[in-house]
Amino acid sequence: MKFSKVGQVSLVSAIALILASAFTACNPVTIDYVFVAGNRENPGQIQVFLADRVSGALSKVGSPISSGGVTPISEAVSTDYQHLYVANQGDNTLVEFTIGGSGSLTSTKTVTMSAEGNTPVAIAMNAAGTLLYVANTYQAGCSKAVSGAATCNGGALAVFPVGSDGSLGAAVSNGGLSYVPVGINPTAVNPLTDGSAVYVANYNPTSGIGYLNGFAATSGGALTSIAGSPFASGVKPVGIASDPTSRFVYVTDFAQNQLIAYSIIDQGVLHPLINGPFKTGNQPSAIVVDPRGRYIYLANELDNSVSAYAIDLATGTPSAAVNTTGSSTNTTGTQPVAILVDPGFGRYVYTANFLDNSLSGFQINPNTGTLSISQNGPYPSVGQPAALASVPHGNHSIQVNQP
């Protein structure tokens, strides 16, 4: 049989369409891999999900794997997106995983903390990908913390150097210790994007006062207290986020249902915005700023909802105009305790819902910041999901908005 040129062109076109259709059908055009850590099982578990570019819908990748320890509580990823770090609260371990091309995880190293403090509550990677900050509930050798005591008088912030291969080194020495002391009951840690400072939230239930410990940071991990630190921060601050230009810090006050906003002035000093605090839903906890620095999203644990705010790029003021009906919108599963915005395109918000073992997903309107529920959610996850992390699939570029 002999084809004419027209027939050959038609055949080539048909084959191309068939191949494109087959590729689309087999591949949901993944933009991100999402890692959720749950602490119901012993050891804890991590489930990998892929996020669809068009809908934001999540699909499981394989079966859950061990978190490498007991009670995983926080996750962080390297800035090259090749490594995942998990803090296991129950046995004081930090576990490093390599991330495969399909989102698969392989455990490569475990660090058991002792001199660095114990009972981790939060971890965070600096923007350079060279330091991992770990907030521990107790100082070395302590199982309680009493404010004002001679010893065991607070929590501990440890700083681990991260090698070019993603491996964790020995904790940086600060004043002869493998940590710097912070207030009692630390809850969250946040390094600024420019690397100049890091902040730790903590609260004193006896006095009913919350604080942020602020530290000036060097590229090598040395920390020195910022003038005026600790900074007053409501009653029970439990979540911290900062904008990508390192000009503003945002904190959730779990006890007073409010969002506290600060401008960062000279040398990392925090100054509360004059028109704050700002109303949230009930029991706000986890908080995130989108990669462009335009919107804030926070999880309300009691309301089972997400509150959304637009950021005034000049002043840092959060406006709830994108979420005018408060907690009655953006419904999640039961007790959302973790939240993230996808790093691939910054178009989707996900929450980990602790009590009903699920993830909720929302699509962001890039022009307004409003949320709409993603397809087929909520998504069943591992038991008692407590931490979320994500890496983009492929190369994506997100432009940070400047004032």
PLM-predicted stretches and their roles:
Residues 10-22:
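Bacterial N-terminal signal peptides
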